[in-house]
Amino acid sequence: PYGMMNFIDVREDDCYYVDKTHYIPLIENANKYFFYIRPRRFGKSLTISMLRHYYNILEADKFEKWYGDLYIGKHPTPERNSYLIIYLNFAVVNAELNSYQQSLDAHCNTEFNFFCDVYAQYLPEGIKEEMNKKKGAIEQLDYLYKECIKTNQQIYLFIDEYDHFTNKILSEPACLEDYKSETHGTGYLRSFFDTVKAGTDSTIKRCFVTGVSPVTMDDLTSGFNIGTNYSLSPEFNEMTGFNEEEVRAMLDYYATTCQFHHSTDELIEAMKPWYDNYCFSEKSYGGTTMYNSNMVLYFVDNYIRNGGYMPRNMVEENIRVDYNKLRMLIRKDKEFAHDASTIQTLVQQGYVTGELKTGFPAETVAEPDNFTSLLFYFGMLTISGTKRGKTLLTIPNQVVREQLYSYLLDTYNEANLRFDNWEKGELASAMAYRGDWKAYFDYIAECLHRYSSQRDKQKGEAYVHGFTLAMTAQNRFYRPISEQENQEGYADIFMFPLLDIYKDMLHSYI
């Protein structure tokens, strides 16, 4: 079901579940301190939920009920239901660095008290009261893992969205110095992860840490040299998200329980350009690509609620990268070379090349390979092979393309860009249904003239091409495709009509 992240709710309510439990043995055989980066809304939280309950020592009696019909129910691992679980979700921690310590302490204290309550039978008597006498998350965690030695218990630590506060750094450059003080040397965040590291020599036997960016990982864990980042590993390429086989199986199932007016093949044809084509490992390129699981569930949910008709809006609003964050990324992009902007190059030639980094400090995000890597981890780029010894990266699908083209307008003029959305929408409708294309493109030409700087104009055709792509990407009736191949060669821009959604539309354009 769309929006559910609690594994137990999914299982107790007998919801449809895409079985990912065959990754449990792989995780168990990997390094005990496991880092995993994926874009937002890609199934990370549900994965953590599934793992937490699988390893929870208190829930052994529920194993058959929750996991019995899944892969892991038939192939359990030696460590199932053998840990005390500490779960920290940094998404609930205030991202303002000046109040981060207080918020982190409060969240950890709540979770540590919960830990003491539910595992009281496995812990020394009075541990909760003594723990609460300690000051802050660092002292309390240090106390807890040392006390677990007395009862010979092992802890599995899960941290979801460990890099939540990085978003603040990327959107507000003034925060960078505060961030550096918190994540380096004796900073509070750095000290917290140092305490986690110390615990790994004791009773914290496993860690599973997720996020959307490797930036914080490099700053916080440069001394945490026992952990391994598996984000680019081919064996975990399909651990989150859905492959096409999984999407087809889901559609086939719902077609037997709900009213469908399209075949599975027709629905795949409609969804694939929008949600598919993620590849997270160079060694996996040419094999299975991944769909954004959140967007697939959004589509299926809307399709069923529409009585078996395509949703008008293929993009769920919450999937969009936060505007201020991406705007900050664009500014970073322009810092290192305005005329060699990664995003402009990506739009104009359809790809960029670089070396994907598994981590880098926040202050170096503007360096070309680091910036390209950041776009990749945010889900704005996908691996599409190699070129001249570097990783070839392209825009994965129409959802991302629509975002990049829209935000690209900000790279052309950081002053007050304001377009009349109502007027633009009316012109787009006339273009689609009456064939009145001239007024629509006259409007784009007027905007191009009005908002372009002299420096932009000197770029000639490449600038006009990029600006036009950015503007036409906001047309809800078409999907602009750059350099589309046809029998006569290549079209600069092909306006592909979205007939699956607007069946009565009559006009398409090159």
Task: List where the protein language model places each region.
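Short glycine-rich substrate-engagement loop in P-loop NTPases that contacts/grips substrate
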Residues: 99, 125-144
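Extended alpha-helical interface modules used as scaffolds for assembling large macromolecular complexes
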Residues: 227, 290-510
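P-loop NTPase motor core
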Residues: 3, 19, 53-117
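Amphipathic alpha-helical segments of the small helical/lid subdomains adjacent to P-loop NTPase cores
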Residues: 216-222, 230-301
